Amino acid sequence: YHLFYQYNPYSTRWDAMHWGHWTSEDLLHWDYHETSFAPDEDYETGVFSGTAITDKDGSHLIMYTADYNKAPDYSTDLSEKNGVRRETQCIARGDGSQYQKYEGNPVISEKEFPEEFTIEDFRDPKLWIGKDGKYYAVTVARKKSDNLGAALLFSSENAVEWQYLDMIRENDGNFGGMWEC
């Protein structure tokens, strides 16, 4: 069993989020592993939530949110801070102990979804392999028109080249604003 978690090794605040990793044979006794992912690429200042699955070849396939935030105080309100924030979806592969980020990351960005959504709030991928053998991912995103969340569905033949399929659920305002994992 593998347990991944998010943490910031430098602070108690959201910032340079990393993925930690524990494994267990029985769910009672756990072994700590070194950090699986750190924000060490140009497109990320934090590695946020995602999904880990066993791929068709038996390796681990992980899709995670790469957060790039250059606001002075790590604020999500960048209009007043004159900063830059963008969230994209990335993949990594591994064998259970070592993981390698895909060199072509990010695999889903603003290029793959409709213009009515904002790249500042586009996160929390849920990844699976369908019965048809294709990869599917559901993410949440914020609409520009009303700042409410929506669930977006994407598909891929190879987990690298993704296409937007549909908005499968839209927030009507009765469930808060932007949705989270």
Residue ranges with predicted function:
Residues 1-124, 128-181:
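Beta-rich carbohydrate-recognition and catalytic domains
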